[in-house]
Structure formats: structure tokens, C-alpha cells
């Protein structure tokens, strides 16, 4: 494997005959195009060709495609995908910039008192919130992810780029037989999406980082499958993303039966099919790097700030300072013990780890 061997028959009786026997592989190279042109003339007579020497020559001018290039789907865009590359701008932040600029233009003629009520840190006072990349604030993260779903993709009422597996009209989640048609005609409100997601997170006891992972999977689905989020499919798309995120990134066992208990009109087989199709549409790419996760976290903070959503801030006092020092000490101890097992720790690190001090006021 790795080389292409071509069989060349050299007849002695008729050296001008350029006929080939056997099967010819369909390739875009000139060699196989010429061979295909010779086959049009017809099949050579067996008596005209005498037994000759058979030589095997390795094709040097043939272009060998890697196996990953052959399996790469053609419908994936060539531009960097934000769910795969941390340097690419996220879709929800890029599409929400237009709304932010329009809001700023409207606020130019108005005197807003919002910035007067905000608290800022100074040399003597420091205000901190409870949201960090490893442990984001649950409520603010859910609201930001909901904004990233409803504002970024601009849910379309007449979206034709959708799939039947996500259509709620074909696969309803509730037991209500009579669903108003107006429910599927108008874009979902922010409160409706937030209530739906918060119910899932409370029932399954998920933390805030699962919301960020779910949003990454949603962007990956929209980019890979080239579909739109519309009023008829947003619930099943969000459900599939949360289901996949909880299964991949949770340390505990998660069963589809647990999600079926939240919806009375869905069976385990339907939930399995939803998960299977979601994985297939994202090409089974469920891995997320730390840089991509951090990019989504900070872009969500920017999106929340642009829409007037702020995490509750607290004054840094002695008790909170000691807690921060304890958390940092725990991280340092993790680094210390992991480095001690590997035998890669310098003397300077031992000196710094003996007594860690915090600047208090």
C-alpha cells in the first residue's frame, strides 16, 4: 500500500498496438484518461498479442489522497469554524454586532443613567463576581446562551433549511394534541428559551459549563449541517445538544431514560434516534479544546454585557480573599503533587509553595 502499480504489456509481434487488458480505475490523472481513450477502439484480438514480459512500474506522477481527505465531507465550509478554531469569531457574537450598533445609535439621543449605577473597582475597593471560566455563574450563563441562540442565529419564520428529526410538528415533546399554529409562526422569546433550558438543567443537575458546551455543539450543528434554527426545531436542537453535552462531559452515568421522564410524549427509541442523528450531523466531532471553550466563555460575557446582563458583584473583603487564596492554594497543591509524581519540580517551586501570602486591605 502507498504506491500505485501499473501493469504494462510489451508485445513483440505488434509493437504499435496500444491496447490494455484488465480493469481500469477511474482517476483524474492524465494516465488513466489516456487509457480510457484507448479502450474506446475496442478489445484486442488474443492471437495478435504474443506472450511478452510483464513489468510493474510505480506511478510517480499520480497524486495520492490521504484517507482523511477522502472522508472529509464536501459540504463543510472552508472558512475556520468557531466551534473548532479558537481564533475564529463566534457566530452569535458576529451576528449580534448589528443589533448592538443599532441600539447604540438609538441611545445617542437619550441620557442613560445605567452607567451611573454600575460599580467599578479602584485602588481601595475591589468588586468581583462569582463567574469564572472553570465555574461560570449558572443563571447568567444560561441567559447568555439563550441570547446566543435567539439573537445570533436570528430564528427565521419561513426557514426551509431544517431536518425532520428536529421538527417538533413531526416529533412533539408535549402531550398536548391541539397545538396552536401561532406557536410555530413566531420567534421564541428569551424568557421561553430560558425557562426551557433552566428546567432541564435543574432536573438533570447540570452546572453552567454544560451550557457553554451545548452552545458549541449547536454552532457546530448549524455550520456542519447547514440548517437554520426556527420556531419548529429550536427545542429539539437544544435538547439534543444538552443531551450530548451531559453524556460526553459528565463524570456520572447519564441515561436517555432520565430525559424521557421530563417529556411524557417521547420514548427512549426516539431519544436514541435524536442523539444518533445529532452525532451524525456533527460528524461525530464531540471534542472541545480548552481554547475553544475559553473563547466561547469570554464571547458570552461580551454578549451579556452588550445586552445589559451583568453578574452580581461583591466587595472583596477578608473572608472572600481568604477563600480565593484557598482556591489558589488548592490549584498549586495539584500542580505540586502532579509534578512530584513525574519528578519534575525545581527548588524554586518548593520555596514558593511553602507559604503563599495574599495582599489584604
From Swiss-Prot:
Residues 204-286 form the Cyclin N-terminal domain. One of its GO terms (biological process) is regulation of canonical Wnt signaling pathway. Coiled coil: none annotated. Keywords: Cyclin. One of its GO terms (molecular function) is protein kinase binding. SMART domains: CYCLIN. GO terms for cellular component: plasma membrane. Belongs to the cyclin family. Cyclin Y subfamily. This is Cyclin-Y-like protein 2. It comes from Homo sapiens (Human).
Amino acid at each position: 500500500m502507498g504506491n500505485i502499480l501499473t501493469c504494462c504489456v510489451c508485445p513483440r509481434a505488434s509493437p504499435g498496438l496500444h491496447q490494455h487488458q484488465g480493469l481500469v480505475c477511474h482517476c483524474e490523472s492524465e494516465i488513466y484518461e489516456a487509457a480510457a481513450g484507448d479502450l474506446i477502439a475496442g478489445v484486442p484480438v488474443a492471437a495478435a498479442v504474443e506472450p511478452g514480459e510483464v513489468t510493474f512500474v510505480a506511478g510517480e506522477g499520480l497524486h495520492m489522497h490521504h484517507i482523511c481527505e477522502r472522508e472529509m465531507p464536501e459540504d463543510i465550509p472552508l472558512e475556520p469554524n468557531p466551534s473548532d478554531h479558537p481564533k475564529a469569531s463566534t457566530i452569535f457574537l458576529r451576528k449580534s454586532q448589528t443589533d448592538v450598533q443599532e441600539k447604540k445609535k438609538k441611545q445617542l439621543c437619550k441620557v442613560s443613567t445605567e452607567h451611573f449605577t454600575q460599580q467599578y473597582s479602584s485602588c481601595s475597593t475591589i468588586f468581583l463576581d462569582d463567574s469564572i471560566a472553570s465555574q461560570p455563574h449558572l443563571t447568567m450563563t444560561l441567559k447568555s446562551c439563550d441570547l446566543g441562540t435567539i439573537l445570533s442565529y436570528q430564528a427565521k419564520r419561513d426557514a426551509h433549511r431544517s431536518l425532520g428529526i428536529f421538527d417538533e410538528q413531526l416529533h412533539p415533546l408535549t402531550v398536548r394534541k391541539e397545538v396552536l399554529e401561532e406557536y410555530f409562526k413566531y420567534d421564541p422569546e428569551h424568557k421561553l428559551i430560558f425557562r426551557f433550558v433552566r428546567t432541564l438543567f435543574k432536573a438533570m443537575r447540570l452546572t453552567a459549563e454544560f451550557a457553554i458546551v451545548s452552545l458549541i455543539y449547536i454552532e457546530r450543528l448549524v455550520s456542519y449541517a447547514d440548517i437554520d434554527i426556527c420556531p419548529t426545531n429550536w427545542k429539539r436542537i437544544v435538547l439534543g445538544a444538552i443531551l450530548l453535552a451531559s453524556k460526553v462531559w459528565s463524570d456520572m452515568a447519564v441515561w436517555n431514560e432520565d430525559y424521557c421522564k421530563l417529556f411524557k410524549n417521547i420514548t427512549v427509541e426516539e431519544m436514541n434516534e435524536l442523539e444518533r442523528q445529532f452525532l451524525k450531523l456533527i460528524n461525530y466531532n464531540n471534542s472541545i479544546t480548552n481554547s475553544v471553550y475559553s473563547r466561547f466563555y469570554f464571547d458570552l460575557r461580551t454578549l451579556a454585557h452588550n445586552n445589559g446582563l451583568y453578574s452580581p458583584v461583591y466587595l472583596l473583603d477578608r473572608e472572600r480573599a481568604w477563600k480565593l487564596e484557598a482556591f489558589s492554594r488548592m490549584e498549586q497543591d495539584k500542580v505540586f503533587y502532579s509534578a512530584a509524581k513525574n519528578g519534575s519540580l525545581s527548588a524554586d517551586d518548593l520555596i514558593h509553595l511553602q507559604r503563599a501570602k495574599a495582599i489584604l486591605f
